[in-house]
Amino acid sequence: VVLQNPAGQLSGLADTVADEIAFDLINQGMAEGLIQKRVEEVATQMGLIEQLNLRPESLSGGQIQRLAIATAIAANPAVLIMDDPTSQMDPLGRRQFFQWLAQVKETTVFIVTSEIDDLCEVADVVWVLHEGQMVAQGRPGEVFNHLAADWQIPAPTIQQLAQKMDWHLADGRYPVNDADLKEVRYVHN
């Protein structure tokens, strides 16, 4: 689990970023050599390799979010739940996170986010909750082409552009991500 407030997820016992990433691995009884290797792998994935010897509290908000993600993925979980994991990241950090997320294949990831454009690029399935009820579920293109006004969810930027330009996919839907945009059929008046 990656919490919306990443500082609340950290152990508070670690002297360094490396120690924080290693914390759960040590508690699981992993061999020391394997721990060091895994810490370096995860730190590289999260862009924290240069911060491994720093104190966790010296990191920026975005770096702390990446550290929280690193601690969550260190043990290779089968399922990962993340609550707004990019809320404190700068645009570059967000882009790097979603690029990393697009590479994740062996882990089922549930992510709560308002980063609609990024979500449309990486999500296989989107669920929409409204007033505590699931009101939609499906592939991003299916869900975002059938948004209800009272859900107060903005359409992805690509979809908004496509609507203004009257660009459609072969099935009549508007594109919602880069891959869809490449399949656009132009409608001429």
Which residues are covered by each model-predicted region?
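Conserved ABC ATPase signature
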Residues: 55-59, 63
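Conserved H-loop
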Residues: 107-112, 115-121
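Conserved beta-strand-loop-alpha-helix hinge in the C-terminal portion
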Residues: 133-158
